């Protein structure tokens, strides 16, 4: 599979504890974890992929992104030998990376999509991966487990719709409490070839995208605080990489 890029638009809508909306442009890589992009040396600082940025390391063998995905699945009783794993994620830019959401689509050896891993990262450095069934028209439900905001508890459950991307990317995640949506996020994008020209172009239209994305999310937290959103006193410590289930 040839790697590709998605020029993306992210939207966040909070309905409680205060009403707040923002959107941000950026881009994401779509890759085969067994065939990560190889760029010219002079371009590598703007697109470097590191296994350490995702999931947990394997207990034995080389520490690669594929090994981390296999380890995560095996730890949950899932064995997909020989199957393709594609991922939507951010690459390191000048050594920095921030992945609010990384998604892995895990296929069996016959090419059938069997599982989806959605890994959420917080600006404080915590992360938690959720194992989901394939999602199409119907979203998958999973309990929220990671503390991602000083104004938001870990109660409630997510509805996640993450169909396998094609020419268009369309991911939706909504947080529900008392059967009502408290928060809705979308990630939409249009597919582009991962050419040198497109990589360079995206550095101009979305420079330092991972750093800007992290700063933008922190700024939204400050905005919520100025709107008198109540702060959560103690952040629950997540069980890293534990699968969430209803």
Q: Where in this protein do the model-derived segments appear?
A:
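Mature, function-bearing regions of proteins
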Residues: 1-246
């Amino acid at each position: 599979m040839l790697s590709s890029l998605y020029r993306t638009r992210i939207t966040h809508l909070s309905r409680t504890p205060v009403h707040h909306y923002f959107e941000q442009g950026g881009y994401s890589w779509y890759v085969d974890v067994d065939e990560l992009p190889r760029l010219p040396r002079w371009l590598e600082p703007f697109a470097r992929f590191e296994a350490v940025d995702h999931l947990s390391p394997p207990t034995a063998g080389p520490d690669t992104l594929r090994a981390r995905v296999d380890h995560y699945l095996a730890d949950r009783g899932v064995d997909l030998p020989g199957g393709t794993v594609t991922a939507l994620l951010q690459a390191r830019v000048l050594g920095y990376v921030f992945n609010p959401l990384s998604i892995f689509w895990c296929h069996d050896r016959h090419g059938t999509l069997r599982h989806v891993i959605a890994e959420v990262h917080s600006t404080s450095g915590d992360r938690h991966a959720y194992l989901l069934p394939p999602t199409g028209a119907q979203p998958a439900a999973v309990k929220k487990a990671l503390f991602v905001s000083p104004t938001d508890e870990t109660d409630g459950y997510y509805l996640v719709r993450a169909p396998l991307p094609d020419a268009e990317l369309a991911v939706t995640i909504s947080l529900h409490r008392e059967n009502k949506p408290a928060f809705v996020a979308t990630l939409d994008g249009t597919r582009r070839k991962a050419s040198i020209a497109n990589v360079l172009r995206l550095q101009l239209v979305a420079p330092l995208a991972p750093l800007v994305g992290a700063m933008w999310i922190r700024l939204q937290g400050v905005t919520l605080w100025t709107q008198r959103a109540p702060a959560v006193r103690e952040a629950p410590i997540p069980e890293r990489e534990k699968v969430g289930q209803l």
